[in-house]
Amino acid sequence: FRYKINRNICQMVKDTPDRINEGKTVGNSVVDDKVIAEIAAHYEAIIKLIGEDTAREGLLKTPVRAAKALVYATRGYRQNVHDIVNGAIFTHEGSRMIIVRDIEFYSFCEHHILPFFGRISIGYIPDGKIIGLSKVARIVDMFARRLQVQERLTEQVCTELQKILSAKGVIARCTAEHL
């Protein structure tokens, strides 16, 4: 057997405390306790509807854990590009394409709410302004952390970079697969 570690899930587990939303954040996003509790109640109902016993030892905390995981995985709805970029736009005299390759992303398909994941490479031709390379990856992550399709994800990232940088051109290549 081959095992592949999903770093994203490991990070999600690390960022998500056992207590409901202590400190009001889940994965660096502000979330109300009521939202977590309401989502958890829906997960509990779903678990019952599929025929499981929510009082079973292994499932006692599952609704709350699943609610926190969903909130973390959809944190892109509570983020904005302005906060991500945080003024990290710099003047640049060059005119050669800047490329950020193989940015890993994880998202949920909007059709079945099942995970999909992949890599996206972004290139842009600057027109006097550049952005830190890590910010490009964070912008990808923000849009990926929403219910998505890969075509829209790609378009949103390119459109946002164009808006931020007024680049001469932006291009992306995205490959993804569903679970």
Predicted stretch roles:
Residues 1-3:
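Aromatic (phenylalanine/tyrosine) cluster motif
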Residues 6-179:
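A domain-level signal for the structural core that forms small-molecule/cofactor-binding pockets
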